[in-house]
């Protein structure tokens, strides 16, 4: 896949989509154009998660380049949203797939994974991590593996 790197952290774009379904990184300067569509979509992902983050916090972190926004498309129609985060740990940089939602998310994430992996590697990441519900382990398949379980209870 031919990549064009834009000045923004996650703005890798495929030169020509190989299928009707494709993924692209959204440059921060274009965030305001996409947010009316992707913001409500992310709300659904937040509701299915632990509620530890609000939509406006994601928006602010995207504007501050702490998170990266990716959209899955069919043609020009936005089908889904993925948020990534780069973390620096003692063992190196890790690219975390954090919030994913939309129609047929598994299909477009798998389609766009090579692009996201190329971006993460170019940014110096040596590991990719997905944080989500247990069903993602089956969707991602090999070479992904479940490393630990996070348990939680209300007080």
Q: Where on the chain are the PLM-derived regions?
A:
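Long, low-complexity, intrinsically disordered polar/charged segments
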Residues: 40-53, 89-100, 152-155
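Short, flexible, glycine/charge-rich loop motifs used to bind or transfer phosphoryl groups or to couple energy/partner
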Residues: 59-60, 85-87, 118
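Short amphipathic alpha-helix that is part of the acyltransferase structural core
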Residues: 2-53
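Active-site rim helix/loop that mediates acceptor-substrate recognition in acyltransferases
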Residues: 46-69
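Acyl-donor binding region in acyl/amide transferases
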Residues: 90-141
